[in-house]
Amino acid sequence: MISSITKENLINFKRPKFELKIRDIKDIKGDFVLTEEAKKRLQKIKNFFDSRIPVLLEGPTGTSKTKTIQVLCHVFKKKLIRFHLSSETNIGDLIGRVVSGGEDSWSSFRFVPGPFTEAFSKGYVLLLEEVNLGQNSVLQCMETSLDTGEINQDVPRYGIIKAKMHPDFIIVATQNPKIEGFTNQRGELSQKFLSRFTVVEFPTVEIDELRIIAKGIAEKNNYKMDDIVRKISDFHYQWIYKEEDSKSTKRGFTLRDINATIKAISNGEAPSDAVICFYGSRYKGKEFNHLLEILKTKYEGLYKNLNLIPKLPYDFPKCYSNYSLKKTFYFANIAKRHDRHLLIVGKEGSGVTQVAKWLSWYFTPEKKRKENFLFIVSPETTVSDMFGKFTPKGDASNFSSGITEWRNGPLTLTIKNGYSGVFDNISYAPAKVIESLNALLDPKDTEEDYYFEIPQNTVEPRVKIHKDFLFVATCSLSQMEKLSPAFLNRFTVINLEDQLEGATEKEEKEAIRHIIESG
């Protein structure tokens, strides 16, 4: 049954005379291109917005669901609040919670509205990402507010919170299909919840539209080699959708990869280097050679002989130099040049943690290298462990009196100061931690993108992302299936191969000597 507010909207629904034109999005940066299909979806969603009908965007990762809403809000000057749901999201995360008064405060506690309450009461657009990861109790709480037109929630240590729904409030949700292999964490939304939304499908982008998108991205980046751009789009489509072997490893490839590739070559990167890095770095052995063979035989100009990989730079940490390590550095260096974050993967015992530490150290500006750190992620890791929390100021007894101060976590220090660090075993992070990272790791196309919200920090909830910020993570190959495609596609994934494969006895002894000397 459709909620009362939606029923009223449907009764009064009249399609506004709205037609989005190219000039409306001329200042939108990034990978959004106004194809005919994108235009139809934008017009449809805008019409639902005008009638205040909740919208559910449904489709695979990387089909521009989020970007579509960002474009609409930008064009029509609507404030947008994004929130990623997870299996650990609770009602307090959405409605709000009581926090200590903050630094030097003697007022014990205060209520800080959550994203749902803020958007609901102020008439903003609320975008709920990955809504089918949310708990039923959280979804039911939102259902009640949509039904009644008000929030009436009991908040521990504070009392009843009440808020009326603003007439301009708009709610949008996204969901990705379960078939993407994200270890069954996606649930089925109830019919009762679904009935409140009008579904807009975002299908897989077909080859003709993909070519238009690639050409549009090239034009935005003033890259005029149409033949190369077409080859990139055709290869992207063939590799992801037409190759039969190991399709599970192709999870995570999206339009972001086309955007990153074209942007890199427009900034001077050789097309072969960009394509092999952004599409091939996660593979090894047979799969990697298969990718190279496709490029060599079908896409002239995108192939490169990787037997000619250069040596490690002279200022790289002292180590046993080998083909696997040189190849990993080669990919990491290209990715870093184009502001891509790094996920180093490999078999257990392959040295991914040590190599990630070396890369993190090398890519950190020299004056900041002493601040590098290793953060070992576990199933018990919390968002507060990563970003920070309020702690008693000075004496622990001050907590009960409200005298507290915010202490940044390692990730916040990295974000603000441009340090680099390694987040080891990232696949062990709880879903709530992973979902909190997605917006942080998004490509940065505008000045506004360089700000990140840390709602737990009521003293400084908005942090500027330093230009030197680099997120380096590790994961074992056997654990990659635990990471969502939405998370994977924010990284250049680099597969560290066996560093002693094919080594001579002399080379093995050299490797052992380096291990002993490094402690």
Regions found by a protein language model. Name each.
Residues 254-255, 269-286:
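Conserved C-terminal helix/linker of AAA+ ATPases
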Residues 255, 259-263:
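N-terminal accessory nucleic-acid engagement/regulatory domains that precede
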Residues 286-298:
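Interdomain linker/hinge connecting the two RecA-like lobes of the SF2 helicase core
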Residues 1-247, 252, 264, 269, ...:
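AAA+ P-loop NTPase catalytic core and its hallmark functional loops
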